[in-house]
Design a protein with these regions (language model features):
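Catalytic cores of alpha/beta
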Residues: 56-91, 111
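Conserved anion-binding
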Residues: 1-47
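Short, well-ordered secondary-structure micro-motifs
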Residues: 12-15, 50-53, 81-83, 106-108
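Thr-Gly-centered strand-to-loop micro-motif
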Residues: 14, 71-72, 97
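Conserved, mostly hydrophobic/aromatic
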Residues: 2, 39, 61, 84, ...
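C-terminal helical cap(s) of enzyme catalytic domains, especially alpha/beta-barrels
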Residues: 85-119
Length: 119
């Protein structure tokens, strides 16, 4: 699994303090595909903010690479989980939930139920 910390389509590093000019999609496409199982795509403009997932940007990233994507950053509601779970055909196969669980916006059981309702 490779983690891609992304701000406006570009890779960020060093605890997100270094904004590169490296396009995230181009970087991932440059790796040998046989060594990659999936990509954790973190939208660092939303991570920990509870602003909601940037669904459009996440889908665009997932559709542009040949690997399953685990979405991260901004999850704030069951609706975010449900919307992401509908994107399996676009390459989004998982989600990282952090602050929303810590802040008790919903329970893990509720998140699982919302995924089962979509499938």
């Amino acid at each position: 699994i490779i983690g891609a910390d992304v701000r406006n389509g570009m890779i960020a590093s060093h605890g997100w303090t270094n904004q590169s000019k490296v396009n995230a999609v181009n970087l991932i496409k440059g790796f040998n595909p046989s060594i990659i199982n999936s990509i954790i795509y973190t939208d660092i403009t939303r991570d920990g903010s509870l602003q909601g997932v940037n669904l459009e940007q996440t889908i665009n990233f997932a559709k542009s690479i040949p690997h399953p994507v685990i979405a991260s950053g901004g999850v704030s509601s069951i609706e975010d989980i449900s919307n992401l779970s509908k994107q399996i055909s676009n390459g989004v196969e998982g989600v990282v939930i952090g602050r929303a669980l810590y802040d008790k916006k919903f329970t893990f059981a509720d998140a699982l139920k919302s995924i089962k309702l979509v499938k």
